[in-house]
Amino acid sequence: RQRLGSEAVRRVFTKTAQLWHNATPHPHWCGLTLLAIDGVFWRTPDTPENDAAFPRQTHAGNPALYPQVKMVCQMELTSHLLTAAAFGTMKNSENELAEQLIEQTGDNTLTLMDKGYYSLGLLNAWSLAGEHRHWMIPLRKGAQYEELRKLGKGDHLVKLKTSPQARKKWPGLGNEVTARLLTVTRKGKVCHLLTSMTDARRFPGGEMADLYSHRWEIELGYREIKQTMQLSRLTLRSKKPELVEQELWGVLLAYNLVRYQMIKMAEHLKGYWPNQLSFSESCGMVMRMLMTLQGASPGRIPELMRDLASMGQLVKLPTRRERAFPRVVKERP
């Protein structure tokens, strides 16, 4: 592991993520691939090397018990394939890490973000980086805007002014940003969604409001990694920073490997998406297949992989019910 380093594993993850994503016929919405970005924290062993490389977060003046790594990933939501990732220390904001994903985002995409990524500079740069690179995000509380035109019920074209600080940081940012504001009521709660999809004819407002709920898929993906793959272990294994980075790229690579096999399984099931299959059961199947391949002749490998792809019927999930309670953060005791 020490001779290999982290860069080689990063390159393998990046290359395979691109290849597998491009090889998958993802379902589209109005011609757009559905993506999401979100952050996740990883705890590292408490060693002097990790402590120096990954400064601890403090709460009320008290340092965290372990050094931590902050990561932001981008995921295709119907397959759960990770398409890009960036990580740093707790001193890096998630927006800083998200900036590294701009150039890795493909054309004809819609990226769903939570309110923590609200930055007109970041959102504007996201749109301008390619062709039809759209985004959707909850409007920041207290944000000031001017309504330009009504597009439908609870649907307006709006103009938002940018700050001098944002224009200084983002040279391509003008004095104003034009966007579309949707006001919807879900389960009695009013929600304001801001998006770059300003063409009301191409992008129906009623469908867009329901679309944002799919952002939760990336959180489910993180749960699959931490609970199933990591067996709910709270701390990574590596005691040196270089190996911590290598381990993280390896975890993402292994997750995508399982997810790509689930894509192959779903192709054999009519009307099923890969995210409607059991990750834990599929992960077990892939692990057993890897052990089988060790003793198989090269000529049998294609047949064994076809057999694995045909087993999707065994890992179908029941219809997912709605969340029974809102997401909450427990208070400290």
Q: Language-model features: where?
A:
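Single, function-defining residue in the core of a domain
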Residues: R3, E7, R11-T16, T24, ...
